Amino acid sequence: MNASDFRRRGKEMVDYMADYLEGIEGRQVYPDVQPGYLRPLIPATAPQEPDTFEDILQDVEKIIMPGVTHWHSPYFFAYFPTASSYPAMLADMLCGAIGCIGFSWAASPACTELETVMMDWLGKMLQLPEAFLAGEAGEGGGVIQGSASEATLVALLAARTKVVRRLQAASPGLTQGAVLEKLVAYASDQAHSSVERAGLIGGVKLKAIPSDGKFAMRASALQEALERDKAAGLIPFFVVATLGTTSCCSFDNLLEVGPICHEEDIWLHVDAAYAGSAFICPEFRHLLNGVEFADSFNFNPHKWLLVNFDCSAMWVKRRTDLTGAFKLDPVYLKHSHQGSGLITDYRHWQLPLGRRFRSLKMWFVFRMYGVKGLQAYIRKHVQLSHEFEAFVLQDPRFEVCAEVTLGLVCFRLKGSDGLNEALLERINSARKIHLVPCRLRGQFVLRFAICSRKVESGHVRLAWEHIRGLAAELLAAEEGKAEIKS
């Protein structure tokens, strides 16, 4: 493919992408395929001679699309949103064209410097404390990670290195192994599974703190666990507070948990993967109160801020906490500016070496939507979730299972877990909408998350009518079974 072909095929691909997204409502949201469907449709080996672009694009529609779950359909209400917007897609195209690997300032100065500035832009949109911003000579700063899971792991490993070095400095004969076997990290019992995985990878104990009636971690429960573990000779070193849990979008109490971590000299990491985008709206910023106590904070613009995956924003108050844990300088990566104090080498802030020019997506989206446009997008999703909540509350057969704060409604049929499992099976088997479940206080609960950029009130109403209809069929069938038994 030469430049002339690229121009022509590029226009065709943009047309295909735009047609796909604008017509996505007409596609079945959840695929009707079985595991292994794709292998028989594709040759067992790569072609010896080139295929044509026309054949490839036809195969996309014939082979790939039947197996796609359409996350951007207005009838997709599962998980949490994954962001999508035309400005971000255009920026991704440019990122692919530039094709730099921005592991250091010297490897691509614009890649590094735009990321630093965009993370400051975003931090100011969130009204983060000044300590988290890079500015021109700040001690903190932001970095784009691949996911919130990565950000949590990076924070845990940095905290682990910091406490090991501190204890070894106080007791020079102390081995790293002796410290590691006593380290304990903590998170709410509602925290994401990636927190547990970070503990496994980091080789430290992770303990779940029981949440309160609103599914939040509170000071009393955390303090009790800390005192118990310290009395047993263990060393608390790391706490993850979640703002907007995956199960029900609950919020740990930072204003209670933060001071405890500060007093105990425990690293506090705040994970707001989904909810963080909402903090650009003044009416939701109070949910972030207490972040001033945190050592690190992250959320995913690639969930709800119209910046395509992957783009997970992470800030730290002290960049030396990261560089102190991860810095390695082989001669082939060194450059003449690294000791100047004027630049950032982001390879020292992350687990991989290589990194894409991801800040281009932020730059395009922030400029083409503006803060007001992004705020309007968030507010619309929140409004739609409250519309669905109202539908549920009006039907005496159903109940809302957790407070609706942002774009997620947790609900269920009043009755057994089996009844709700059967309802979810009917919903997803019909393939008109797509939902996933969670468990709250041991109960099987359905989650309705507002996800698509194109979702409107009409889609929410149709989804609710569909759920109500399937519930009526299910309840009638259950009633019939009961009559037969009696």
UniProtKB/Swiss-Prot annotation:
Q: What are the cysteine partners in each disulfide bond?
A: none
What metabolic or biological pathway is this protein involved in?
Answer: Catecholamine biosynthesis; dopamine biosynthesis; dopamine from L-tyrosine: step 2/2
Q: Which residues carry this modification: N-acetylmethionine?
A: M1
The cofactors required by this protein are: pyridoxal 5'-phosphate
- Swiss-Prot/TrEMBL catalytic activity: L-dopa + H(+) = dopamine + CO2; 5-hydroxy-L-tryptophan + H(+) = serotonin + CO2
- Return the EC number: 4.1.1.28
At the top level, the lineage of the source is Eukaryota
What's its top-level EC category? lyase
Residue numbers carrying N6-(pyridoxal phosphate)lysine: K303
Which family does this protein fall into?
Answer: Belongs to the group II decarboxylase family.
Q: What is this protein called?
A: Aromatic-L-amino-acid decarboxylase
Source organism: Sus scrofa (Pig)
